[in-house]
Amino acid sequence: MVTNITKRDGRRRKFSITKISSAIEAAFKETEEKYTDEDLDRLVQTVVDEISKDGAKTVKVEDIQNVIEKTLMNFGFHDTAKQFILYREERNRVRDTKSDIVKTIKEITESNLKSSNILRDNANESGATPAGAYGKIASETNKMYNLLNNIDRKYAIEHKDGAIHIHDLNQYNLTFNCLFAPVGKLLRHGFDSGTGFLRAPQSIQTAAALTAVILQLQSNQQFGGIADDNIDFDLAPFVDLSFKKNLKTELIRYEEYSGSPACAGDMDKLLKTVSMNQPVERLNMLFPHKCVEKAIKKTDDDTHQAMEGLIGNLNSLQSRSGNQVPFSSLNFGLDTSNCGRMVSANLIRSQMEGLGDGLTAIFPILIFKLMKGYTKNPEDPNYDLYQRSLECLARRFYPNFVRVDSSFNAPYVKYREKIIDVKGVLSLELKVRGRDEVEQVFVNEDVVFDQPKYEFEVGTGEYWEIAAIENGMLKLRKLIENTTVSTMGCRTRVLGNINGAEQTTGRGNLAFHTINLPRLAIEAHMAADTVEERKAIFFEKLQNILQDVKGSLLDRFALISKKTYESYPFTMQQGLYLTSDDEPHDVTDTVGEVFRQGSLSIGYVGIAEVVTLITGKTWGVDHDIDDFALSIVKTIRKFCDEQQKETHLNWSCFATPAEAVAGRFANIDKNKFENEKKLKDVDLYRIFGKGYYTNSHMIDYSVNTSLVNKLKTEAPFHKLTNAGHIFYYKLNGDLSKNIDAVKHVIDAMYDADLGYFTVTMDSDDCLECGFHGIINDACPKCGCKNEDKFVRVRRITGYLTGSPRKSITKSWNDGKLAELRDRHNI
């Protein structure tokens, strides 16, 4: 007779027939199958007899459950047996989750960075510090809570099994991904920080300081990147305010020393009519030219200090999660006004100079906008800023580049238009775009400018481009800056919008999931022998998993749409998200309608591995399979476009950065398929043996390829991946000594119709002697061999990592370290 049971954790308890009866009865109640008390008694007795037949005094809980399932089936209660199995699986899932939580907390609190991938899943957030460990415990616990309670069981299993990856699972039930913050709007009108109202700044220094505050406050109410899509346009008005202050100071000083009036009439009234955006020669007609010169110089110094402070703050405000600076990005380059150009020039200058210790600033990610007529060609007004950006890139990794006028970005660019009647006027003094020069232009000759050369002042310091002079009319246009594409540093972007304005400002990605494409290819390879059969099976599986990802993303959207304005006191109540302040609202109002301005994205990794598994060929080498690879992403993009029409939400296709997921997918698949006989004809090292899957559609990093070939292979994917993409190519040597080569490469990327791109390199610093260059085992200058004295800066996805506190060898997860080992072409 059985007297004891052994639970799964090894504990022993007294055997109870009543518990067997209760378990069977509970299963019956979940079905419509009829049963009697006699049926229940017979079932229980049969179970008891079966577990007692060997004479054992103690049995395991799982053995009893196995007998219950078998007995129910034998007695014909099939539905009840199925229900009992489901109940058992659910209990196992709950039990396993609780066990996982304990194991995870133990790993976080008792491991170090070198031994724990959990502590290194984000290269710019250390899990080793007290605040970091505390955050990791909360993060990992909420991941498990979401898998257990908030996510459909099917999708949770697919995530745990590695078929898909639900990104930022720790924030699944809390908030959204990223946002292009309307920094200019908040600076112009002031904002409530939560502890008090901050009025509009009156100088560039204060504006830059408040910009860091805005980005920091917003980053705490989301989980992804925070960006300003046009920092030059946003900060330019405050450069002008500083100029007027500085000019007034110089004028007063002039009057004190000279004893003569510095200007004709009332000084304060006159200052209201001028702007630093106006040509210097006009300002010199109103004020002593030395006063103007000194005011401009002082304003430039102020702007330089402001940009230094902005970069410094964004590298030191570790308030996000108590252990992380805001994942910030600044887009710039298209403002051709004097004030806007001063912002851009000093942003580049400050990045070039580095932080206080001369090291490279990891944040913010600087992104320079390339566009013909503005920045790209020698005749463009901001071409000089492009040249400076290239010099900065060669020394400091940043800026990255976004092509505003690519074939897939240009259609979104919009202009305001205005017509000025100048009939009867023979000529006008017009400002040359981006310069202080003024030229006399005859207006009685019709001319249309393909690339506008001149500007016309329509308000104090506000200049519009002259697109044409026709029949005595000036046809003016002004770029609407937030219709020009911007990107988060990692690559995420938004632009198209079926629910409102097609702009970047005030919008962002809500959530994205990534599909493990190599998993589908592994299963297709095992199921068929011919390439065509494998392709057919692969695409069938892809369609099925796309439906599941759609369902999971819609569930996530529904969950966060139930959040209220009080959940996001800064984002919603201060009007950062587009339409959030269109109408009066109560703090208990839900935010679902506002979130319809954002996007849901489906990402992918492992095109390189898929090509090998399905065709046996090498991505980026055998170009006869290019169409097949492209058709995979076309399928995902088509699906996203279809869902946009069906659900009336913004869906987009994403070339996943794959920081943590690259290694996770590969390790799961290695454990699952490494010994499969049907994969014996595959070089599994090229698939998951190397420890990671290749980012999105990129050529395998171990392939030593040319720039031309890499562009030919990867460029066509950019027009398909409207949620974000990036292209980079690795150059060797000291790039600061070969700016022409850097320009040649960036120009080639621009010409290839890419959307977002940059070059990358290795960059090391020795803290012992200050050497900057490439350090192998020892510093070539002082001979130091202490790794802790070396700062090795590397690009991990779209952003950088590397500092004395977060050396790449300490902060990168195993998958990314394996990738770094293989890198030849990025």
Functional labels for PLM-detected ranges:
Residues 1-108, 808, 816-822:
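Charged, amphipathic alpha-helical regulatory modules used
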Residues 25, 48, 550, 554, ...:
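Amphipathic, well-packed alpha-helical segments that form the structural scaffold of globular domains
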Residues 90-94, 100-596, 617-618, 622-795:
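Conserved catalytic cores of very large enzyme subunits
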Residues 3, 47-53, 328-329, 609-611, ...:
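Short, hydrophobic beta-strand segments
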Residues 600-613, 634, 795:
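Contiguous, well-ordered alpha-helical segments that form the cores/surfaces of helical PPI scaffolds
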Residues 301, 305, 613, 808, ...:
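Metallocofactor- and cofactor-centric catalytic cores in central/energy metabolism, strongly enriched
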Residues 780-826:
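Long insertion/accessory domains within large nucleic-acid-processing enzymes
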